[in-house]
Amino acid sequence: MNILLIGIDNAGLITPIVEEMRQQGHAVTFIENGEISRYDYLHPVERISNLISKALFKRNLKQERSWLSTTQFLNGFTKNRHFDITILTNPDIYTAEHLTQIKKCTNRMICHLWDSTLRMPNNIKNISLFDKVLSFDPQDVKKYGFTPVTNYYKNNLTPLQPNRNYDGDVFGIFSFDRERYAFITAFLDANPDLKIKIMIYVDHQRKIKKIRDERVEIITKPITGDELLAISSAYHCILDIGYQSQKGLSFRFFESLAYEQKIISNNNTAETYPFFHPNNIFCITDEDLKVSPDFLAIPYHHISDEIKNQYRLDIWVNKYIKAML
């Protein structure tokens, strides 16, 4: 099939999907949102003018110019092109007119929501324009009738050696968020006997000032791939802290499944998935953040390949495409 995918690949999560689709014989065009809908101020005066316009006339001139730039790009891009499927992951940044223009060059236009509608409500303002909506959030699937889709793990991930050397009990790495940071400090307070390593990535100096807990390590550059694995694999458990406004499982669950590494999470939706086992996944709540010592002591319970492989990227992509038809 001829597939167009429009989205953001900040965390490098879309590129593996594109590569696997191509590996399976599909022709895939991937466009970053920033290539379509980007407008930068040409002069400081423009920024000031926009601030005045928003304050006095409720008009966002930068947004209007960005929308115009998007319209011009789409008019040129969609001309003489046609796709079997077009997938958008961030519909909130496009107007109804933009989506209608995209729809003219495709047989089926699909929305794939990587965030819940509670967290990103603008994602569904033009949802009726899509032929199908896929969502990782079970609450949205139930409420709106969206098609469920999980996250995945990459094909090359294999179980960690169970007899490897350990530096500690729990490892967690996160981008800064006030809600998440408060939960992290509470978790640390509740588990003083555990050896826990927490790293928080910040992309602005003002955020650094908000992290005052000395138990938290601040990083200013993202850590990914083999560098991250070298750190995380030295701990018995991975810490996952999701937003209260969404219940879909993060990529940490699926990577932990591939690595056969235990995970601690505040997302109790994990208990409803076929790969759940109490030896491997420990759920905490706002009211009870204490991790049972037994959870760390008992061995990892092997999950059958039949269940585990459902989330491996090659099999996942095959199911993903079928779900859009």
Q: In which residue ranges do the predicted regions lie?
A:
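Nucleotide-sugar donor-binding catalytic core of glycosyltransferases
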Residues: 1-73, 80, 90-97, 114-250, ...
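Short acidic/histidine-rich motifs immediately flanking catalytic phosphotransfer sites
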Residues: 81-85
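Surface-exposed amphipathic alpha-helices with a cationic face
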Residues: 99-106, 188
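A short helix->loop->beta-strand "cap" motif at the edges of active sites that frequently abuts
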Residues: 105-108, 131, 259-261
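Pol beta-like nucleotidyltransferase catalytic core
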Residues: 258, 262-325
